[in-house]
Amino acid sequence: EMQRSLVGSEMCIRDRSGDSLLDGRGDAYCGMLNASYNLKLRNIKAYIPEYPVGTAEECADMIHEFEPIARAIVALNDLKIISFGPRPLNFLACNAPIKQLYNIGVEIEENSELDLFEAFNKHAGDERIPAIVKEMEEELGAGNKKPEILPKLAQYEITLKDWVEEHKGYRKYVALTSKCWPAFQTQFGFVPCYVNSRLTAQGIPVSCEVDIYGTLSEFIGTVVSQDTV
C-alpha cells in the first residue's frame, strides 16, 4: 500500500515486511525526515501537517485544511500596512520591527499624525459627508447618543478611505493603524473607535495605538476565517 505525503512529490511507502519502527510505517517516517531535510537545504518553506501521511483520499481532504494557510500566504503578499504616528509612550507591546514584515511579503508605509491631521482638515465640507452620516445614524439607531459628532466621524472615515486608495499602489489589500490618544481626542475633536470598527467590518482592519503587528494579526485572522476579526 502506497501512502502519499503532502510534501512535494515525496512518497511515503508502507513497509510491507512489517519490520519497521512504529505501526508498520518505518519507511514513511524515514521518507518524511529526508523530505524535510531536502526542503531545508533548498530554503523552501513548506507546510507539513501534524499527520502528513495518508491514502490519496485522505491527502485530498488534508488539502482543504491547507486552504486557509494558502489564502493567508497569498494575501500577505498583496498587503500594505499604513500607520500614522509613533506608538504611544509605554506601549512597548506595540513595538514592531518592520524587517519581519518584508520577510513575509508585507509592505508598510509609515506616516506621522500630522500627515493624517492635514488630510483630515482638507476633507472639511466634503460632499460625501452627509451620506456617511446617514449610514451611521441608521447603523447606530437608539445608540446614537452623540449625533453632533457624526459629521466629524464621517469626515475622518472618508479621509482614511481616500488615503487607502491614493497610497495602496499595486497592493490589493490595506490594513491601518493609528493612535487614539492622548492628543488625538483634543486635536481631532473625537475618538476614532467607531470609525475603526466600521472600516474593519468593511474589510480594512484597523488597530489602535500604532499596533502594527496587531493590525497584521487582524488581517491574517480575517483571511483565514473569512470573517471580520
Model-derived features: where do they sit?
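Anaerobic metallocofactor- and corrinoid-dependent redox/one-carbon enzyme cores
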Residues: 28, 90, 100-103, 153-229
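Short loop/turn segments at strand-loop or loop-helix junctions that form parts
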Residues: 13-16, 179-181
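Single conserved hydrophobic/aromatic residue that forms the stacking wall/gate
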Residues: 2-8, 12
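Cap/lid and interdomain-hinge subdomains that line or gate substrate/regulatory clefts
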Residues: 16-144
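Active-site loops and adjacent core secondary-structure elements that bind or stabilize anionic groups
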Residues: 11-12, 135-161, 165-166, 170
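Beta-sheet entry/capping signal
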Residues: 10, 45, 80, 107-108, ...
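Structural motif
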Residues: 1, 84-88, 180
